[in-house]
C-alpha cells in the first residue's frame, strides 16, 4: 500500500510551526563587570546641581547679613531700648549661624568627595575642585564681612554705653565695661543710674539693653572664631588637594613628553633598520655578483669553454 506523503508533509509542517512559536532566543550576554558603576556625566551634573544649591544658601546667608547690618544701624540710632529690633537682630543672627553651619558641612562633604576622585580623572577632579574653591571663597568673604560688622557694632555699642554713663558722671574704662558686660554684672556697675525718675529708669534700661546685646555679641564672636577655625582647616585641605591635582597634571605632562621622545626614538631606529636592511640587500647582491664573476673567471681559466 503506498504511503500517504501529503499527510506526512502536513504533520511535519505542523511540528515545525509549534517549534517556531516555542523558540526562545538566547539571552544577550551582558558583561556587568565591564560596565562602569557610575556614569561620569550624570555624576558631574549632580555635583553641579549641589553646588548650585549651596550658592543659593550663600545668597540667603548674604541676605541675613544685610538684615543684620540694617538692624545694627537702627539700634545705634534709636534712643532708648528697642526690644522689637533687638529680637529681630537675635533672630537673624541665629539664622545666619544656622545657615553658615549647614553650608560649612555641605562644603566639607563636597571637599571629601572631590578628594576621593581617582587621579586618572584629572579633568573632572580639577573642574570639581575649581567649583568647591569658588564656593569656599564666596563663603569666606561673607563670614569675614559678618565678623567685621560684629566687631564694628561692638565698638560702637561700647562707646554709646560710655556716653550714657557720662551723663551720670560715671567714668569707666574700656576694660571695666568689658568685664562688666562679659560677666553680666553691668547692673552692679550702673546701679547709680537707676533712680526714681522715669527718665533715669529709661536711661538705665537702654544701657542694660546695649549690655545684653554686647553679651550676645561676645557669644557669637566665639562661635565665629570656631567656624573660622573649621573653615581654615577645610581651605588648607582643599589647597593640598589642588596641589595634588597640579602634581598629577605635571607628572602626566612629563610622561607625555617622555612618550613622545620614545616614539621619535623608535621612528629613528626604524629608519636605521630600514637603511641597514637595504644596505645588507645591496651588499648581498654585490657579493653574489662578485661570486658569480669569480666562478665564471675560474671556469674560463681552467676549462677551454670560454
Curated annotation (Swiss-Prot):
Keyword entries, A-Z: Cell membrane, Coiled coil, Membrane, Neurotransmitter transport, Transmembrane, Transmembrane helix, Transport
GO cellular component terms listed in the entry, alphabetical order: endomembrane system; plasma membrane; presynapse; SNARE complex
Residues in the Extracellular compartment per record: 301-306
Predominant cellular place of this UniProt entry's protein: membrane
GO molecular function: SNAP receptor activity; SNARE binding
Expression sites (tissue/organ): Expressed in body wall, pharyngeal, vulval and enteric muscles and in some head neurons.
Localisation: Cell membrane
InterPro entries per record: SNARE, Syntaxin, Syntaxin/epimorphin_CS, Syntaxin_N, T_SNARE_dom
Ranges that cross the membrane: 280-300
CDD domains xref list: SynN
Record topology, Cytoplasmic segments: 1-279
Protein's name in the database: Putative syntaxin-3
Native source organism of the sequence: Caenorhabditis elegans
Gene: syx-3
Amino acid at each position: 500500500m503506498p504511503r500517504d506523503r501529503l499527510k506526512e508533509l502536513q504533520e511535519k509542517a505542523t511540528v515545525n510551526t509549534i517549534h517556531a512559536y516555542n523558540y526562545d532566543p538566547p539571552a544577550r550576554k551582558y558583561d556587568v563587570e565591564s560596565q562602569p558603576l557610575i556614569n561620569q556625566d550624570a555624576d558631574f551634573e549632580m555635583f553641579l546641581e549641589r553646588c548650585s544649591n549651596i550658592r543659593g544658601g550663600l545668597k540667603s546667608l548674604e541676605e541675613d547679613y544685610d538684615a543684620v547690618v540694617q538692624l545694627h544701624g537702627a539700634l545705634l540710632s534709636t534712643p532708648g531700648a528697642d526690644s522689637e529690633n533687638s529680637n529681630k537682630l537675635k533672630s537673624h543672627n541665629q539664622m545666619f549661624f544656622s545657615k553658615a553651619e549647614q553650608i560649612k558641612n555641605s562644603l566639607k562633604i563636597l571637599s571629601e568627595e572631590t578628594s576621593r576622585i581617582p587621579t586618572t580623572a584629572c579633568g573632572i577632579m580639577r573642574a570639581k575642585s575649581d567649583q568647591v574653591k569658588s564656593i569656599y571663597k564666596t563663603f569666606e568673604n561673607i563670614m569675614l564681612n559678618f565678623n567685621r560688622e560684629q566687631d564694628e557694632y561692638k565698638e560702637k555699642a561700647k562707646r554709646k554705653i560710655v556716653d550714657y554713663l557720662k551723663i551720670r558722671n560715671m567714668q569707666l574704662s574700656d576694660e571695666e565695661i568689658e568685664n562688666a558686660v562679659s560677666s553680666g554684672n553691668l547692673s552692679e556697675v550702673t546701679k547709680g543710674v537707676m533712680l526714681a525718675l522715669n527718665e533715669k529708669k529709661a536711661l538705665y534700661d537702654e544701657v542694660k539693653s546695649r549690655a545684653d546685646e554686647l553679651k550676645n555679641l561676645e557669644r557669637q564672636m566665639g562661635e565665629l572664631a570656631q567656624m573660622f577655625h573649621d573653615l581654615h582647616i577645610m581651605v588648607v585641605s582643599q589647597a593640598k588637594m589642588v596641589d595634588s591635582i597640579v602634581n598629577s597634571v605635571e607628572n602626566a605632562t612629563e610622561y607625555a613628553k617622555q612618550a613622545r621622545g620614545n616614539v621619535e626614538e623608535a621612528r629613528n631606529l626604524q629608519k636605521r633598520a630600514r637603511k641597514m636592511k637595504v644596505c645588507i640587500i645591496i651588499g648581498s647582491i654585490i657579493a653574489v655578483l662578485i661570486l658569480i664573476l669569480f666562478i665564471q673567471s675560474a671556469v674560463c681559466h681552467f676549462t677551454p669553454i670560454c
